[in-house]
């Protein structure tokens, strides 16, 4: 087995994690058992893959875009009956293993240049369900993205992404990761996070989720502006003031100061108002 002559390719966002302690923390955070079937996206040279297979899981199914790395990985793990590998773009191809049976966990050092669309594919988005509901994802992310996922209302990192992910999942931080832990070293710091998507039955009504998404798109266009300005396009000011009074918020607050559940409450009130108007007009 050899990866000789293969250098990290910038267009693929390749930065290989080499720190053994961090690799072990990632595997530990996954809480793996013999029945687990794990999806790994962007295995690179197989450092994390090796650790996952040593944990005695039922299957590690890896997806790698770089065709040269696919060859090297097949050589390295050719003897492993619990390993399967598919070459291709994780944003486009099926994530299912060859046997067609779904995996239940995702453990990956995600290429930073596809973080947002890949995260959306793995956990879904407001108003839409993912192809598979994974029990747990342990992801190595760019620290800036991880901080947005974990941020609380009022913190500088709190954003529309914070609201979206927190309405779909429960998340926690595992550890920060220095650029020195990679080869080549990225220009940014990283963080390992655990993400546990809610069961489909625990999610909000689809119409309410879509309404929340619409509100977020409108409100966070003017992140630094007050709600009375950012939401002015969706309702007359007197209606907005009435809704704010009912919910105990102020239109002088900014979008990043409003909690995820308060966005849900606002979406429900507006949804009910529109429904009532529709009934009256009919």
UniProtKB/Swiss-Prot annotation:
Class in the EC hierarchy, top level: transferase
Reactions catalysed, as given in the entry: adenosine(1518)/adenosine(1519) in 16S rRNA + 4 S-adenosyl-L-methionine = N(6)-dimethyladenosine(1518)/N(6)-dimethyladenosine(1519) in 16S rRNA + 4 S-adenosyl-L-homocysteine + 4 H(+)
GO MF term set: 16S rRNA (adenine(1518)-N(6)/adenine(1519)-N(6))-dimethyltransferase activity; RNA binding
Keywords: Cytoplasm, Methyltransferase, RNA-binding, rRNA processing, S-adenosyl-L-methionine, Transferase
Residues that, per the record, bind S-adenosyl-L-methionine: 15, 17, 42, 64, 89, 109
Stretches that traverse the bilayer: none
GO cellular component: cytosol
Entry similarity comment: Belongs to the class I-like SAM-binding methyltransferase superfamily. rRNA adenine N(6)-methyltransferase family. RsmA subfamily.
Descriptive protein name: Ribosomal RNA small subunit methyltransferase A
Organism per entry: Prochlorococcus marinus (strain MIT 9211)
Species classification: Bacteria, Bacillati, Cyanobacteriota, Cyanophyceae, Synechococcales
């Amino acid at each position: 087995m050899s990866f000789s002559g293969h250098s990290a390719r910038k267009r693929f966002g390749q930065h290989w994690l080499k720190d053994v302690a961090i690799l072990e923390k990632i595997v530990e955070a996954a809480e793996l058992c013999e029945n687990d079937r794990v999806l790994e996206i962007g295995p690179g040279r197989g450092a994390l893959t090796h650790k996952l297979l040593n944990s005695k899981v039922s299957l590690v199914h890896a997806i790698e875009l770089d065709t040269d790395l696919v060859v090297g990985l097949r050589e390295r793990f050719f003897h492993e009956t619990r390993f399967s590998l598919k070459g291709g773009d994780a944003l486009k191809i099926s994530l299912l293993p060859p046997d067609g049976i779904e995996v239940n966990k995702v453990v990956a050092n995600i290429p930073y240049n596809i973080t947002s669309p890949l995260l959306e594919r793995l956990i879904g988005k407001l108003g839409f369900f993912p192809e598979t509901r994974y029990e747990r994802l342990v992801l190595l992310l760019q620290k800036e993205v991880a901080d947005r996922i974990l941020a609380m209302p009022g913190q500088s990192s709190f954003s529309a992404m914070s609201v979206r992910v927190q309405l779909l999942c429960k998340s926690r931080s595992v550890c920060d990761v220095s650029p020195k832990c990679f080869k080549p070293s990225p220009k940014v710091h990283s963080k390992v996070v655990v993400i546990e998507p809610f069961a489909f039955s625990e999610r909000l009504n689809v119409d309410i989720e879509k309404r929340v998404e619409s509100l977020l798109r409108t409100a966070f266009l003017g992140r630094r502006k007050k709600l009375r300005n950012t939401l002015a396009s969706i309702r007359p000011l007197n209606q907005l003031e009435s809704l704010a009074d009912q919910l105990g918020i102020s239109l002088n607050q900014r979008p990043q100061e409003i909690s995820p559940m308060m966005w849900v409450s606002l979406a429900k009130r507006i949804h009910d108002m529109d429904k009532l108007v529709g009934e009256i007009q009919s």
